[in-house]
């Protein structure tokens, strides 16, 4: 834009001076030639300044990230990790999650269930325990290896979809496709020109909210942690898709500990046990249908979620 504007300005000014007799036609042609010669260097300079500005902004952001200090650290002398199939418990709410079961937590206040998910996964200050050992007394790497939090705002990054779903690159295609099936994301994959080798745009902008949620769920299932905690994993999908996910999730996580924060009847009807959270405390536990019949507060919370559909 600016180089072109320079040529227009020089031509106009030169023509005006030539008409007034202050510039000869030969001088005008020569001056125009000089201006045209400067167009390419000027354009290159402008582009370089723009790229330098963007680079400086990006560098400052990277530096800010690199300077961040993690809020959580491993203790100086970590406690011994409990064995597999350990019970997960949160004294603050009274929730106890039996090992190997699919447990749901229902709360009328989403912030309460999200806070519980953060405590159970040691992404916030907590006195939660695994096998009777406080999470914050275990080595942080051990906790991250054994417990995975799938939060409400899934994030996708730029790159190939295969690398997005399987960052380690250790998983074969058959296992990846099985996880995609469990997350009911086959239609998302089918719509991509190169399927698993398709490029994902920044933040997954080419996908809808429901598609991003299912791809992130696929990634969580492929991680295959001992304990998977999911905060509203189906909030952005339609009822038919949610029902398929609920059915397949149970099979995909069979024998492993899974906690789902949700108010969806479609999911609740397929879990082993439901815990009702009121005011941040567990006030009732049991099968979905029993709580639906016996507990008015539970019935009101779940029915409201059903009406939202």
For each feature predicted by the language model, list its residue ranges.
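ABC-fold ATPase nucleotide-binding domain signature/coupling loops
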Residues: 186-215, 219, 230, 237, ...
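ABC ATPase nucleotide-binding domain helical subdomain, centered on the C-loop/LSGGQ "ABC signature"
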Residues: 83, 162-201, 226, 247, ...
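Primarily ABC-family ATPase nucleotide-binding module
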Residues: 66-109, 251-254
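Conserved signature/switch motifs of ABC ATPase nucleotide-binding domains
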Residues: 223, 229-230, 235, 254
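A hydrophobic transmembrane-helix motif
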Residues: 1-29
